[in-house]
Amino acid sequence: MAADLSAAEQAETENLQYRGGRLYWSGGSAAAAAGRAGVKADKREGDGATPAGTYPLVSILYRPDKVPAPRSQLPVRPLTSTDGWVDEPADVNYNRPVSLPYPASAEEMWREDDLYDALVVIGYNTEPVISGAGSAIFLHVATPDFAPTAGCIAVKREVLLGLLPVLSPGSKITITGRDDQATGGRVVHIDGSSANSWYQPASLG
């Protein structure tokens, strides 16, 4: 269920854009990592590329043992240790969440690291789902050194948590290649100095 938000937080739809190793929104920008193979229009399962294009931001998943329930107009759901996401192209539930154990290959969403402490599901390859076109594309927490991802977009945890309250149904992310094509998705600027002002560190507890 979406959390209750103030009128100011519901004022307008916030859209995001990734380009050249940074994530942009109306209030600023921050360093971001993309796929190790860069940004591609013809993404395939397992190629390490981030899909180019504009996609809806669908919902939020979070680790209830690590962060409080995020405030957002998007649907918010806590992860559990049995959550998975199918990455087997031949399976009927390809690119869909499932409960583990599952008979086909599926990514474990309850990770030992911090990358999925909170994430936004990006609506890539969903309507319809095309076998082999790529799965489990998220906006999630970056590694400390902003290492390239397997195809997702990743930012600092405080940046991600700060953006969640202003995302709403209708919010989209536009992903373009440009400068990141030459670096395989590795970020050049990792300062994070443009992290937005909506985030309050005390809210993490």
Residue ranges and their predicted role:
Residues 1-149, 160-205:
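Cell wall/extracellular polymer interaction/catalysis modules
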Residues 152:
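Short cysteine clusters
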Residues 155:
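A conserved hydrophobic position in a structured secondary element of the catalytic/binding core
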